[in-house]
């Protein structure tokens, strides 16, 4: 059941499961302006037998309030607000972020290093330069998405949408890129049910926000880190995860064969098993 909590002036939608006294895992979803907590909560709730799993929609996303500002820094501070509310002011948590959520997870683990015991990153990148790799990958896979284009990726997905409807339509036509086994009917239903907020997307891709770069700060991360990526990840190609794992002290890289950006869904049992093993070390 979805519940709501006020954090830093915003009403944030969340789900939580698992024993109240267990270590808290906060999952961070991807998708600037279009993501929500539901997929991650479903994917990672099997860990709820031993951990408390908290998944939430960022401000301006999903069922959470459209409370500005929509910035990386504000969302990172909201994450810490959720940590303090559900774990306690002095408690460490496990941060699990994928894609855009992985960007936020890195920023959180740098800014609030003492608040993170373990960091799990999925299909993400250490800087905005992943966009160059995504464009090259799309050039090779355009046959999978005949209604999508390089221009749409550059100018819309990595730029700005004119409306929520345009956002929804572009996301539908690009959906086959995300998984190695695409279900068109499920993709249509997902796009119909999903909330698209062009304003929050555009703010988070604005000139002030889009040029994030953690490459020089990854060494400041002290959490025990696992980096998971599918070998076919199109939008955050594996070289990004390899770089992160190399720069964070004692980080472990888990490269999953025949999996794409949605590796945690495509290879759910394998990924959950690996996360459990990492947390039990």
Curated annotation (Swiss-Prot):
GO terms for cellular component: membrane. It comes from the Eukaryota. One of its GO terms (molecular function) is aminopeptidase activity. Residues 23-267 form the AB hydrolase-1 domain. It is an enzyme of class 3 (hydrolase). One of its GO terms (biological process) is melanin biosynthetic process. The lineage of its organism: Eukaryota, Fungi, Dikarya, Ascomycota, Pezizomycotina. Belongs to the peptidase S33 family. Its EC number is 3.4.11.5. Disruption phenotype: Does not affect the production of scytalone. It catalyses: Release of N-terminal proline from a peptide. Proline iminopeptidase; part of the gene cluster that mediates the biosynthesis of dihydroxynaphthalene (DHN)-melanin, a bluish-green pigment forming a dark layer in the conidial wall that protects the conidia from UV radiations. The first step of the pathway is the production of the pentaketide 1,3,6,8-tetrahydroxynaphthalene (1,3,6,8-THN or T4HN) by the polyketide synthase PfmaE though condensation of acetyl-CoA with malonyl-CoA. T4HN is not stable and easily oxidizes into the stable form flaviolin. T4HN is also substrate of the hydroxynaphthalene reductase PfmaG to yield scytalone. This is Proline iminopeptidase PfmaB.
């Amino acid at each position: 059941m979805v519940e709501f909590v006020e954090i830093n002036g915003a009403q944030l939608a969340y789900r939580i499961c698992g024993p109240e006294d267990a270590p808290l895992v906060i999952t961070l979803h991807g998708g600037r302006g279009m993501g929500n907590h539901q997929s991650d909560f479903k994917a990672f709730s099997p860990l709820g037998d031993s951990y408390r799993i908290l998944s939430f929609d960022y401000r301006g996303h999903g069922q959470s309030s459209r409370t500005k500002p929509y910035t990386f820094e504000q969302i990172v501070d909201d994450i810490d607000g959720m940590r303090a509310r559900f774990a306690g002011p002095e408690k460490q948590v496990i941060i699990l972020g994928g894609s855009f959520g992985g960007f936020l997870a890195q920023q959180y683990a740098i800014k609030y290093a003492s608040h993170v015991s373990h960091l799990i990153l999925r299909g993400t990148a250490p800087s905005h330069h992943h966009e160059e790799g995504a464009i090259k990958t799309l050039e090779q896979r355009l046959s999978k998405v005949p209604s999508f284009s390089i221009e749409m990726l550059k100018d819309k997905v990595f730029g700005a949408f004119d409306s929520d409807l345009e956002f929804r339509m572009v996301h539908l036509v690009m959906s086959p890129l995300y998984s190695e086994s695409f279900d068109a009917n499920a993709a249509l239903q997902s796009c119909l049910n999903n909330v698209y907020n062009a304003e929050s997307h555009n703010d988070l891709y604005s000139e002030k926000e889009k040029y994030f770069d953690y490459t020089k700060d990854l060494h400041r991360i002290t959490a025990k880190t696992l980096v998971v990526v599918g070998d076919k990840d199109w939008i955050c190609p594996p070289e990004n995860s390899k770089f992160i794992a190399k720069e964070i002290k004692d980080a472990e890289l888990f490269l999953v064969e025949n999996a794409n950006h949605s590796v945690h869904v495509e290879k759910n049992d394998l990924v959950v098993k690996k996360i459990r093993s990492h947390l039990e070390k």
